[in-house]
Curated annotation (Swiss-Prot):
Composition bias type Acidic residues, residue spans: 103-112
Name the record gives this protein: Macrodomain Ori protein
Misc: MaoP belongs to a group of proteins conserved in Enterobacteria that coevolved with the Dam DNA methylase and that includes SeqA, MukBEF and MatP, which are all involved in the control of chromosome conformation and segregation.
Species per Swiss-Prot/TrEMBL record: Escherichia coli (strain K12)
Described purpose of this protein according to its UniProt entry: Involved in the organization of the Ori region of the chromosome into a macrodomain (MD). It constrains DNA mobility in the Ori macrodomain and limits long-distance DNA interactions with other chromosomal regions. Is part of a system composed of two elements: MaoP, which can act both in cis and in trans, and a cis-acting target sequence called maoS.
Listed GO CC annotations: cytosol
Similarity comment: Belongs to the MaoP family.
Segments for region (Disordered): 91-112
NCBIfam families the record matches: PRK11027.1-1, PRK11027.1-2, PRK11027.1-4
Keyword Electron transport part of the UniProt annotation: no
Positions of modified residues (N6-acetyllysine): K15
Effects seen without this gene: Inactivation of the gene affects Ori macrodomain organization and Ori positioning. It removes constraints on DNA mobility in the Ori macrodomain and allows long-range interaction between Ori and Right macrodomains.
InterPro entries given in the database record: DUF413
Amino acid sequence: MAESFTTTNRYFDNKHYPRGFSRHGDFTIKEAQLLERHGYAFNELDLGKREPVTEEEKLFVAVCRGEREPVTEAERVWSKYMTRIKRPKRFHTLSGGKPQVEGAEDYTDSDD
């Protein structure tokens, strides 16, 4: 991976991980570091903004397109990241039922 995925930019996803990859808990420290170091290149390859140069990058693009399963660590981390950001956010409510409108029981439809 020395020649593959080279970039001078660090990758941060402030929309989904505003406190950073390592502080969120979805990724191990090693995975978070890999995303920060090479995520910019991963993203450009995935979006087609950058042409793959090495064989490893060509295989990475094939994984992004769904043509093969992730094998390398970089492929697995990027697949895990994409899965995490595409899933719907879970939220919990304090009540178990449907929201009720106050005063709904008091209303009657009569012409009195």
